[in-house]
Amino acid sequence: MEQQRKLFQQRGYSEDLLPKTQSQRTWKTFNYFTLWMGSVHNVPNYVMVGGFFILGLSTFSIMLAIILSAFFIAAVMVLNGAAGSKYGVPFAMILRASYGVRGALFPGLLRGGIAAIMWFGLQCYAGSLACLILIGKIWPGFLTLGGDFTLLGLSLPGLITFLIFWLVNVGIGFGGGKVLNKFTAILNPCIYIVFGGMAIWAISLVGIGPIFDYIPSGIQKAENGGFLFLVVINAVVAVWAAPAVSASDFTQNAHSFREQALGQTLGLVVAYILFAVAGVCIIAGASIHYGADTWNVLDIVQRWDSLFASFFAVLVILMTTISTNATGNIIPAGYQIAAIAPTKLTYKNGVLIASIISLLICPWKLMENQDSIYLFLDIIGGMLGPVIGVMMAHYFVVMRGQINLDELYTAPGDYKYYDNGFNLTAFSVTLVAVILSLGGKFIHFMEPLSRVSWFVGVIVAFAAYALLKKRTTAEKTGEQKTIG
């Protein structure tokens, strides 16, 4: 391993992109158990639970669908992170195995560039709004600071809270996995206290019976419950399309495959059991108690009389936003941008570039057209499902769990593998799978497929790529020399 690392360094690769040595792989089961809790318990996910009630499904059906989703998520996170835990290599380099040295840049930029940076900015802005609530409860005069002053549409209090929250997120990004580990270890028990406590509060207010009988006003019980049950599972799993595709950014630190597999599985299942119970109890209970559909946990917290309870709850919600932003956005963006110019950029350079771009796009302006921006990001997310399918088919079916690292860490300008550095089979399969999974957003008769787009994209891409690559034994590169 040391000889390989020295060779790759001579080719110009930065330390951040090199395969981790065994001594550098320090993450154990507990680290992975705590990793994703904040990404499960965040404001958008709780709002999503409210949307599930609109489908007309029962409370129990929604809870069961959410819990079952955890097993699909865990399976994909573990399996797509297998190469990372085996070889200690980040996503940006693993992607080269299936798409080619040059071809990997396109799906990599979709995930680590466009989607991650835009979501990072949007999450920073959303978090700053919660921060504004928090400061406003302690210091009401802060909300009128600066009078009518605005900068690019932001008031002075809004600008201050955004920059503070942005800087905290950037700091976590610079710290990488080591800082994130310490942060999530503190966050996890706080999540149990806040969201578990909110669930108990909701049950004590209205009782468990009314919660299980809750249906939003004007909504009829669903007739095609089986398909809608699958739609709920797809919606929950699809949220993880981006983190799952770049799972190796975290599994590269694993002490062993078993540690990351056990830790992620237990962590995600436990997190989603709590989320399923707390989510439906909080949303249904609050809606019944206040006499109106109330699906945003921040709106619920704002109604509380206790300043301490509100302060602590909003603080934890802010922490979950930071955790989500780190695991899902800024850390993958840092690695991916570094991979664009591996001889010139480091991970921290990537974090800095991504952070600055997230400021320049003015996320508060993007939020003025929420429907358009979320549709755009949803389409990008829909493209990542097929990428997962291709990556897993290549690693497990075509290469049978083996990767030739020397062919991933090629010298600059060396594109002898695949067609000038592009795996055209991977791109063709990805395109077909994307059309099938997202076509329903634009073509009416394909609409049912788009409602289960993540499953369609992953399954079609996995099956098609595995079949095509198995049959194509005499490609230009030849299967014996295929990257991976």
Model-derived segments and spans:
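Hydrophobic, membrane-embedded alpha-helices of multi-pass small-molecule transporters
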Residues: 27-46, 161-168, 199-206, 217-280, ...
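Membrane-interface loop-to-helix entry segments
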Residues: 125-128, 160-204, 264-268, 376-385
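Juxtamembrane transmembrane-helix boundary signature
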Residues: 66-99, 111-125, 282-286, 322-323, ...
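Selective recognition of specific alpha-helical transmembrane segments in multi-pass small-molecule
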Residues: 41-45, 68-76, 111-123, 189-204, ...
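C-terminal membrane-solvent junction of multi-pass transporters and transport-like membrane proteins
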Residues: 19, 23, 387-464, 471, ...
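Membrane-interface "cap" regions at the ends of multi-pass membrane proteins
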Residues: 1-59, 71, 196, 205-209, ...
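Hydrophobic alpha-helical segments and their helix-loop junctions in multi-pass secondary transporters
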Residues: 124, 128-137, 190-218, 239-240, ...
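Transmembrane alpha-helical segments of multi-pass small-molecule transport proteins
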Residues: 108-109, 135-175, 189-198, 228-247, ...
